[in-house]
């Protein structure tokens, strides 16, 4: 038993930094890039949903319906394994960024749309009474208020995305879960390695949660 515990402790220590390195080099950048691009897509999609132009509104609804109605893992498989059949071959990391970006764009667009819609119509009317155009009203009056409403759910989405990046292992991205599988193949200790990965994800998520709480307090002071 003592030899077993020593071996497990040795594996834990030796694997911790390779896993942490994978998290810092692949998992965190994948999360940040996907969320950044996803927010841009989400904002445009939300505006399209709120648009009076029926074609834009319908296209945005269709996009959100497709992404929210299909599993993220299937979407990643279509991008990485499916597109080569029509001559489009993408790097695994790029495929993951595209897949997660589309997912963030669809889900976060609903958050942004709801935040914008929550601002009273009187705000629009007051800004237009001051001679502002619709675009100026959106940028100067509506969006600053909508951001405060959207921050908490968007922060939750960011934390969820961090955990969802483990799915990228299925398309060979060398993030933490993929590295843990490689180490497991050598050590035959899946329980230890997967618990270790879960611990690192928990550390990352806890840091983000504390950051989120501080941001919410900061924004609450300015309401």
Please provide the spans of the model-predicted regions.
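Transmembrane alpha-helices and adjacent helix-loop boundaries
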Residues: 1-223
